[in-house]
């Protein structure tokens, strides 16, 4: 990901204010509600029958935290996202067979959730930087696909 020093600083500063437990669960939950076809990858999560069921599902929250812990780690390695996410890319490609388009959808949902949580601090400049990051992460996760 090609970010200016200013963009890297803004991303790091605002990510430090994010409660990844909360944001991760909310972002994954929103993905499953807004794009219901993504639920097929989460059959073992139990009740995903309604928006309220998804958003209150403890397995969705737990997996969302796991996803965003990995995302947080990626923010420390912006110059090597492909390397950082290589094993996750392989897992999602070879074993889970996740459509790589879903990574882009999740990234866009994350931007919405960050805007909601950060309010006025989520300026257009910060949004632009985060959009570059989520696009870079989505591309890194899609890297192992043929």
UniProtKB/Swiss-Prot annotation:
Pfam families noted in UniProt = Globin (PF00042)
What this chain does, per the record?
Involved in oxygen transport from the lung to the various peripheral tissues.
Q: Which PROSITE patterns match?
A: GLOBIN
Lineage per the UniProt record: Eukaryota, Metazoa, Chordata, Craniata, Vertebrata
Q: What is this protein called?
A: Hemoglobin subunit beta
Keyword Metal-binding assigned to the entry: answer is: yes
Q: Which family does it belong to?
A: Belongs to the globin family.
N6-acetyllysine PTM positions: 59, 82, 144
């Amino acid at each position: 990901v090609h970010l200016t020093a200013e963009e890297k600083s803004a991303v790091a500063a605002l990510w430090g204010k994010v409660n990844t437990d909360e944001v991760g669960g909310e972002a994954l939950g929103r993905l499953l509600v807004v794009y219901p076809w993504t639920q097929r990858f989460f059959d073992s999560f139990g009740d995903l029958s309604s928006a309220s069921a998804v958003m209150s599902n403890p397995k969705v929250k737990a997996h969302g935290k796991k996803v965003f812990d990995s995302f947080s780690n990626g923010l420390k390695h912006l110059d090597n996202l492909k390397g950082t996410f290589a094993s996750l890319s392989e897992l999602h490609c070879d074993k889970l067979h996740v459509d790589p388009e879903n990574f882009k959808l999740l990234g866009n949902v994350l931007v919405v959730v960050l805007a909601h949580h950060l309010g006025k601090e989520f300026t257009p400049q910060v949004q632009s930087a985060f959009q570059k990051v989520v696009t870079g992460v989505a591309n890194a996760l899609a890297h192992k696909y043929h």
